[in-house]
Amino acid sequence: MLALGPVELGGQKMERGDIKVFKTGERYFPPKSGEYLEVAIKPAHPQVTAPSADTPPAPDNKILYDGKQFTIFEEKMQPGETSSRHSHNQRLAIFLNRTQVQQWTDGKSETRELVPDLVTFRPAVVHTSKDVGSVPIRNILIEFKP
């Protein structure tokens, strides 16, 4: 579960960007108020692909959860900041701030608007990113393990 604003889950107060992972068979009562996302990873999901072994690793993002099948991390960039060239496995990206990112993949440049609370599937890729917006990039990434 990802809090999109103030919520209370099992007596624990959560703020925008906070997560809580529930293991298979674990039960909970959803928040009675507030905005949040629930992400369910099914046991028979398609096989995960990863970039080739010689690609550079993802930058040091804050790891929020590291499990056997996936890692959840928070990705942050300041306006004007450019990442080093890096790779990701297949992942879900949830954008928390409205801003713009420029990415260079395979020599091609693309600028995209990041829309808050939008959940997107992102393929395995090697790229460089730059925050070209006026506010920081803040994303929650659920990266699948092959």
Predicted regions and their residues:
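Glycine- and acidic-residue-biased ligand/ion/polar-headgroup-sensing regions
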Residues: 1-10, 88-107
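A short glycine-rich, His/Asp/Glu-containing loop-to-beta-strand
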Residues: 1-4, 56-83, 90-93, 141-142
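Histidine-centered active-site/metal-ligand motif
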Residues: 4, 26-29, 85-90, 127-128
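Short hydrophobic/aromatic-rich beta-strand segments that constitute the beta-sheet cores
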Residues: 9-10, 38-39, 72-73, 101-103, ...
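Short acidic-glycine-tyrosine-enriched beta hairpin
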Residues: 9-27, 106-125
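Short histidine-centered beta-strand/loop micro-motifs
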Residues: 11-12, 30-31, 75, 82-87, ...
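Ligand-binding loop in jelly-roll beta-barrel domains
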Residues: 24-45, 98, 124-146
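Surface-exposed beta-loop interaction hotspot
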Residues: 27-72, 76
